[in-house]
């Protein structure tokens, strides 16, 4: 409920989900936490997280819990709030992001099977917080310039801390922005980037490297910030 933070710890057991996980923390400066083990229980599950940034909570829902699931089932993040995944998750279905999703574990997105999809919707951000996406089996679809939850520098894909690599291909489903925020940090995009007529903007004071082919036919490549871009 609004105005009260939550802490859920499954201990040595697990919490078997039967529907949507909803956190309505509009007036709470604290971060809600789910620890232990979560089972997706035969479906792709939605985490609906509202935004309490006005109350001072940079992260609205922190999930260090291990998220497991049968083959083909994943997670959908909805709502304008920020959710952080820091467990070594074992699900292998699709991941869809609305709002902000932060990754703090190299296995936060689960097991890199060949059928994985990773979609960042419009006005939304996928944030790398000290980790990359090391498998090419996570093709990424970007749909815009990100949201403003992280401040004036935003992106559909944001490298917030560390020298990190996104190994998979990136498809631009709209004109999109990628941010490498901090000096001394580097974001490497190792896969090919495609997008027909859509443009790509690289933003921030961190470095960036495009290791694959940039396959837009008439879209523009724009660079802002003091970081170095290597093609």
Walk through the language-model features, giving the residues of each.
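Short, tryptophan-glycine- and acidic/Ser/Thr-enriched carbohydrate-recognition patches
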Residues: 5, 17, 153-157, 164-166
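Extracellular lectin-like interaction modules
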Residues: 4-10
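Short, surface-exposed loop motifs enriched in S/T, G, D/E and P with embedded aromatic residues
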Residues: 137-140, 168
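Residues at the C-termini of beta-strands that transition into short coil/loop
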Residues: 144, 161, 182
């Amino acid at each position: 409920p609004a105005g009260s933070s939550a802490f859920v710890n499954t201990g040595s057991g697990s919490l078997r989900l039967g529907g949507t996980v909803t956190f309505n923390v509009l007036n709470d400066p604290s971060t809600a936490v789910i620890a232990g083990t979560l089972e997706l229980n035969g479906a792709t599950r939605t985490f609906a997280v509202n935004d309490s940034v006005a109350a001072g909570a940079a992260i609205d829902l922190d999930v260090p819990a291990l998220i497991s699931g049968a083959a083909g089932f994943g997670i959908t993040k909805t709502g304008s709030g920020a959710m952080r995944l820091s467990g070594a998750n074992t699900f292998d279905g699709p991941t869809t992001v609305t709002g902000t999703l932060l990754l703090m574990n190299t296995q936060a997105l689960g097991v890199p099977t060949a059928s994985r999809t990773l979609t960042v919707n419009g006005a939304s951000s996928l944030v790398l917080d000290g980790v990359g996406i090391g498998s090419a089996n996570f093709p990424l679809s970007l749909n815009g310039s990100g949201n403003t939850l992280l401040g004036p520098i935003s992106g559909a894909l944001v490298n917030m801390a560390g020298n990190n690599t996104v190994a998979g291909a990136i498809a631009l489903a709209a004109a999109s922005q990628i941010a490498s925020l901090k000096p001394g940090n580097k974001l490497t995009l190792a896969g090919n980037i495609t997008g027909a007529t859509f443009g790509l903007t690289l933003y921030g004071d961190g470095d960036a490297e495009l290791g694959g082919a940039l396959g837009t036919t008439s879209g523009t490549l724009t660079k802002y910030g003091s970081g170095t871009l290597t093609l």
